[in-house]
């Protein structure tokens, strides 16, 4: 189980991402359409002035049951350990164990 503080930190990053997402997208579109280098430098300074935790790359997917940051399956939003337990307990319908 992950520490509660780490899970809260991820939630805070997600909120910041949502808050600045539209403005960041606007600045990036404006930068791609601008030809002047001076204007691009100004836009880059504005981008750098945004909070670091508002970038989408700082957000890490976590298991929603345990908070484990590694080995997550996107389809289920679960870590591999919990996914395996739930499959064996028949809690995920339609998922079968592979055999060949």
UniProtKB/Swiss-Prot annotation:
Primary localization class, coarse: plastid
UniProt-recorded name of the protein: Small ribosomal subunit protein uS14c
Protein species of origin: Anthoceros angustus
Keywords assigned by UniProt, alphabetized: Chloroplast, Plastid, Ribonucleoprotein, Ribosomal protein, RNA-binding, rRNA-binding
Similarity section: Belongs to the universal ribosomal protein uS14 family.
GO terms for biological process, alphabetical: translation
General function of this protein: Binds 16S rRNA, required for the assembly of 30S particles.
Database matches in PANTHER family: 30S RIBOSOMAL PROTEIN S14, SMALL RIBOSOMAL SUBUNIT PROTEIN US14M
Oligomer and partners: Part of the 30S ribosomal subunit.
Cysteine pairings via disulfide bonds: none
């Amino acid at each position: 189980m992950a520490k509660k503080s780490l899970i809260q930190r991820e939630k805070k990053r997600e909120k910041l991402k949502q808050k600045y997402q539209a403005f960041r997208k606007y600045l990036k579109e404006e930068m791609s359409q601008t030809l002047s280098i001076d204007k691009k430098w100004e836009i880059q300074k504005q981008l750098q002035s945004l909070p670091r935790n508002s970038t989408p790359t700082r957000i890490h997917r976590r298991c929603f049951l345990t908070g484990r940051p590694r080995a997550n399956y996107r389809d289920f939003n679960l870590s591999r350990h919990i996914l395996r337990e739930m499959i064996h307990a028949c809690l995920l319908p339609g998922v079968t164990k592979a055999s060949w």
